[in-house]
Amino acid sequence: MNNDLLKRMRAYRGYKQYEIAEIIGLSRQTYNYKENGRLPLTSEEIVKISRELSLTLKDVNDIFFNGQLPN
């Protein structure tokens, strides 16, 4: 996962960590651990974050799969 890209995209879209945490049903601390790579995100969390941030498929691939998904 590209943690820095996720942080930049979240900030660019105007969200604070606690807001994304609330949206996906996590505590702010747990979301912080996940955003910083200390804990993995579940596929359901990836979907919720992607929808909330209006990420493109390319964004999702670059952020969550390090560009490793086939085109």
Regions found by a protein language model. Name each.
Residues 4-23:
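Short basic helix-loop element that most often maps to the first helix and adjoining turn
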Residues 2, 13, 39-42:
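Flexible coil/turn residues that form the inter-helical turn or adjacent wing/linker of helix-turn-helix
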Residues 9-12, 51, 58-71:
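Short, charged recognition helix plus adjacent turn
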Residues 38-51:
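Short, basic-rich loop-to-helix N-cap that marks the start of a DNA-contacting helix
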Residues 26-40:
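Recognition helix of helix-turn-helix/homeodomain-like DNA-binding domains
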Residues 1-4, 69-71:
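Short, Lys/Arg-enriched, disordered terminal segments
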